[in-house]
Amino acid sequence: MNVLELRDVSIIYQNTKEAVKHVSFAVPEGKIVAIVGESGSGKSTLIRAAIGLLPAGGELASGQILFGEKDMAVMTAEELRHVRGEGMAMIFQNAGDYLNPRRKVCDQYVETLRCHQPMTKKQGYEIAKKMLATLKLPDTKHVMNAYPFQLSGGMKQRVAIAMAMSMHPKLLLADEPTSALDVTVQAQVVKQMMDLRDKMGTAIVIVTHNMGVASKMADYIAVMQNGELKEFGTREQVIYHPENDYTKKLLTVVPKLQGETDGE
Amino acid sequence: MENNQEIIRLENVSKTFDLRYHKTLRAVDDVSLSLHKGICTAIVGESGCGKSTLARMVTLLEPVTDGMIYYKNEPIGGMQNGRNIALRGEKLREYRRNVQMIFQDPANVFSPRMKIGTFLMEPWIHYEKKSKKEAREMAYYSLKRVYLGEEYFDKYPHQLSGGELQRIAIARAIALHPEVLICDEATSALDVSIQQEIMALLKEHQDETNYAILFISHDLALVENFSQQVVVMYLGRIVEIMNGAAFRKHARHPYTKALLGSVFSIYDDPDKEIYVLEGEAQSPTGEIKGCVFCNRCSQAKDICRREAPVLKPIRTGHQVACHFV
């Protein structure tokens, strides 16, 4: 079954520029789909539309976005509130900026949980602590009692992922979750997202411009350029047998380490 | 001038910043390094390892706390006999002419109210004392060198894309044929296809005028394809210096290996176990005893926590700071 399905989606901004043009693809349950493309290709717009958080002026011009069986466009605000958080969750590029700088991590974490599921603060605290431990954050107690500025970028990103994952959503949307991070931290975050998929069966849509990350994580890869979906296929198909010229170009311009192709 | 001539030499350069409550932060610690004509030296490392501070010291934007920087064997900035010396006045102007810098985000480099043409005319008017008319001709020529048409002369920065702006930043930097070009993450804000064009441009002009490049980056694959010498930094110290080619095979320091292990490449087997470096880097404030990497290193022994390893040569052009190499 498909968790998310996009049918002929077009998105227009107020300046009448079409940011996304007639894009259709589906995300099967428990699979990872990577959307790759360069800046301005509409990949972030697409993923924001999927959770119903288009920036001001953005509008779904045509097509349908189906979550499970339901059309997102006809949902009431209350239904949407339930879908977000429990059904699907999102991680942004600078997740640290989305944490409230004046409140401790534990307070905002527990509040987020209690918004969606009935529980006491104590229960929420326990769940949060367990989730942070799953994400291999060192010294969870310290992290819980810290203010966001006391944590490093990688730690904040992992806190955000933990928050997003602790409601066990069916679908996780990640908008460039690793591009602000160093390579070693990126490796940690990628590994943990893949572990979560394996353990909880969450489907993930990850937007990235890093072909390496896309190739590592994804089961399916979608290539976008200028708002159009250029190619969509399984990882093997897109990486080893690209059909579209733009995909081929994208693959050749990525700098490669020597001794990479022959497996060290 | 012949190739391989030494242009800039850093000797035991350190930089500490004073923080509140009498704490200090060691951004760069005891770094020795030299830049040669026609050679691209790359510095790689994670954020906070001091690579940008190092670049700012070489361009004399930041005073040196300890050690000395030499330009063609002349001391230009650092500590001498307990006194901080740095170039000033006309000499500093002359130095700036020869050492140019390209920054990470081209959008922040340009004044939004200045036309591209004015921006490109400036070096000629300020340094070569050209008339406006001549400078205009030179600006057209500069545009041509980076494959942009003359119509860009009358445009404003906001009308251009990041890649085009970066080209113009390069055009201005290389206008007066500098001897050293310092690129601080010059391509990391750009898309990969544009990154390739920019790198090709830098390479092409390097073949032409033979400037030395100090290339700061965190993209290991890019660095390998582009530079002849690679310097790996961790927490302000150099942990490994090696030749650019095939460094995946030659890397010896555990940190370099960890860095290489965390790069995802397109054609890797997706089922391959991801190598994860445990823990967080030590705090750069206060004194660090022993090896900077010891708290995350899998091979760390007692000696690593007691003594800081020094850089020792293991082959020509390859130095490693590790007790077990």
Where are these regions (language model features)?
Chain A
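A short, proline-enriched helix->beta-strand linker immediately N-terminal to the Walker B motif
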Residues: 166-170
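ABC ATPase "signature
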Residues: 229-233
